Amino acid sequence: MDSAGSLKRLSPAELRLLMRQNDPRITITSGLAKGYQQAGVIFLPNQHADDFEAFCHNNPGPLTFLYRSQQGESSCPPLAGNVDIRTDISKYCVYEAGHVVRTLSSLMSLTCELRTSSSEQQPVAASDSLSQQLSDMVCLYLGCSFGFESKLKDAGVPVRNVEQGKNVSMYKSTVPCVPVGVFSCPLVVTMRPIPAALLNVAVEVTHLNPLAHGAPVHIGEPALLGIPDLSRPDYGDPVELQPGDVPVFWACGVTAIQAILSSKVPLAFSHSPGCMFLTDIPDSSTSIITPTPNSDNPPNNQLNPELTPLSFLVSHNPLLYSLVSRRAVAKIRHLEMIIGEDPGEEGTKDLFSQKDLLHSCLALSHSRSVAVTTGVSTHHLHSSPDQIDGWIPGAIAIANMLLSLGKTVTLITDSRFLEMTKAIVDEAVNMGVLNTATPLLTVEDSSPNAALDLLCHHGDTSKPRYDHIVAVECRGTATDRANVREENVKHQVGPVEELFITAQDISGITTTGVSNWGGYAVACGLFLLNTCPSHQRYLKRGLGKETTTSQEQLQDWTDNLPSVEKEQLLRSTLMQSGLQNGKSGNSVAGALTFTPDDNNIITRLLKVIYEGSMSEN
């Protein structure tokens, strides 16, 4: 019987006993204690314990709080029996004033003088034994992703680091945790290569194990987390991706070690990364203790299956996937069905394809700075009136919701439309249809690099001004380049459409094209994503308290949804602007009349949102 194989058959209690005896066969605990949760441990002076516990509750993704001991307590009854936490881990780290000063196989072995790295700190007396130091300390136990590895394997998902006989790869990101007191640090993540075809399996399995960090916090390009090179992890070993694998990142409890280092507390101890405490808690458990009455983050005793996240590809370059709950996906699919009906026979089906709406909403949700571009002329003669009635309502609906979500929004139009569009936008602000004025730009067609210069700072494709371009009623996004009267307008593709086409080749900028009604649906879809806890957790990387959306915030988002009243006011403004209808080519006076079909679409879109709870939280 091989040594590694025999260890994998042992129970957590048997493995803890071997570690207490300093068995040299046990180092990294990944792959051990199948079917049980593992935990990280942090020993801190009692005076820092309250702040550190609050730090954990403010950053529940990486710091899944399991148990806090009493001062000097070496056992942890809710997690395991017959435990001495001073000896039952294979390797410990000793920290002094923000530095790792040594590693130990047992905290009971350290009785010599503990050197102090900072001249500003009081030195630890040589006569003080470790037991005296530990008597003033509190031990905090945190969840570990090793706890979901066996479930992944059972579901057919390869665990590459175990296959390769390595510790998991751990990286310091540039994403800041929510600070509390002296504790402030960047998020640390683990990376596991997952076959693209098995992403949803891995997401669901880990979501169902919240004690082991839950679902991933990022899937795709490491640079989006500030990780420059996967071959150089900050902790653990480099794990090789196999063909077809995607890098998937989970929040990691080693974040706690980074917090200890940055806090520069005089003395602290922890497990060594990858050398975890083995609990007796099954990996199927979602909670281990009853929350205290005043707990800000009570554990989930029952996970709602409708909130199970699904993964969706958002961008190839850079590679980015997003997560959203089954419930939100179903509602956005319903929105998509409504706008795909084209009741006014305006040719909007040319701008519609299955799953486009969800992709558009996810791309916008991940964006910070968005440019909304407009449709092109639908007449051959520049002297004739132009069709901008089709895009303005949808563009304003998108802009309203994006602004309420705190994103930067810029409207971009053809220079021939500038004066008219500005007047309409200003009037929309005055009427309260548009929440606030937004920058309005044009693309000059006098320069061959005009589109690139507008999209990127100084025309440098590595410095894009926007991370998403959405084209409303932009016929260049249709495969036949035709207007709604089925006339080919390819020869009329102007600077605005050139902007959209140029953006598609710039890394870091995603693009989508929607119809006018698609603009309304996007606004509703963004509302659904921002009230979806699974999606919000992913956007926030598992950081921040997991509380329900405030009523004030929810009301603001609701106020910025499309409405029948807003559409009627905007139609009135458009009718006064001398525009013509894109389908008939006739005056807008009759064509812009608010019809029962128009009322019906908006009402049905809003009904999808209001059905059931306003928020999934």
What feature does the model see in each segment?
Residues 2-145, 189-250, 254-258, 262-426, ...:
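Metallocofactor- and cofactor-centric catalytic cores in central/energy metabolism, strongly enriched
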Residues 111-116, 423-503:
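An acidic, phosphate/nucleotide-engaging active-site surface
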Residues 151, 158-168, 392-394, 398-406, ...:
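Short, acidic/small-residue loops that bind anionic groups at enzyme active sites
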Residues 162-172, 273-277:
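Short linear loop/turn motifs
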Residues 164-167, 407, 414-417, 474-475:
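Short, ordered loop/turn segments at secondary-structure junctions
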Residues 172-189:
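Surface-exposed beta-loop interaction hotspot
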Residues 486-546:
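Short alpha-helices
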Residues 550-554:
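A C-terminal functional module that forms or caps the active site or interfaces directly
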